[in-house]
Amino acid sequence: MWAPGVAATLTYDIATPAVIALQIAAARRPDDEALTTTVDGAPVAITEVAGSGGPLGGRTHLVTCGRGQLVVTYAGNGPSPAARAIAPTAFDRIVALRPSRYCPSDRLVGYAARYRRGDDLATVRAIVADVHDSLVYDATATGPTTDAIDTLLAGRGVCRDYAHLTVALCRAVDVPARVAAVYAPGLDPMDFHLVAETALADGWLVWDATRLAPRQSLVRVATGRDAADVAFGTVLSGTAQLVGMAITAVADGDLPTDDHDGLVRLP
């Protein structure tokens, strides 16, 4: 188990008093972490939403602030070596089979049939390999409304598009799948990252069709049906514009080697 150190700094210009929901803290509360918020250099309160943590979510924090420049800073270590992955429940599997906003799997059933193999693991591996081989990583080819079908037709996208297409195709062949927002040591350029997870046997297996970072050192931030559930920042009221973001994720020692075909579980 690699225990990376992670950090994020988000800068918002607040034009009118705003309430912002943030999901940037590690889902498994680290032994050592700090989360601070300031507006024009003066501290403002940030609170963790009660009940927001859990196997299917991440820890959500709320900040209420007036006009000015809001700076949110988070730093923490990764999960402890003793942290264990959480097995899917029956309800988890049901939720992870349903179509969702960015993963309209019900519209891909006929197309996805080509990936069926002798068992679910072989089917998932075929899907992940084909998503990797058929898409071009292109940050200019995607937007906030792009869903898995848009990505399939365009043949290009970013990490969230790779994850959405992987998840949608898995659900279309009756394999429960979800997304996980993560810190990703080794990612270049550094950013928040989105990967897919499938419920196979007694655990959630993580897949990254971009192959841009080793899965063994990923640090879970939030988990959900698709990107709508795991957004790092959501303006709930007021007027706020994200004007800056800096992400850091560092492994403890050398990065692990990942062939992106083996079985990896995230705590």
Language-model features: locations:
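Ordered, amphipathic secondary-structure segments that act as subunit-interaction surfaces
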Residues: 74, 78-90, 95
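Hydrophobic/aromatic-rich core segments of domains that either
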Residues: 129, 161-239
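Secondary-structure boundary elements
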Residues: 14, 82, 93-157, 165, ...
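Short flexible/disordered coil segments
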Residues: 21-23, 198-213, 238-259
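Residue-level signal for pocket-adjacent positions within structured domains
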Residues: 58, 92, 147, 216
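Generic structural "secondary-structure junction" signal
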Residues: 22, 137-139, 154, 185, ...
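Intrinsically disordered, low-complexity N-terminal segments that are enriched in acidic
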Residues: 1-81
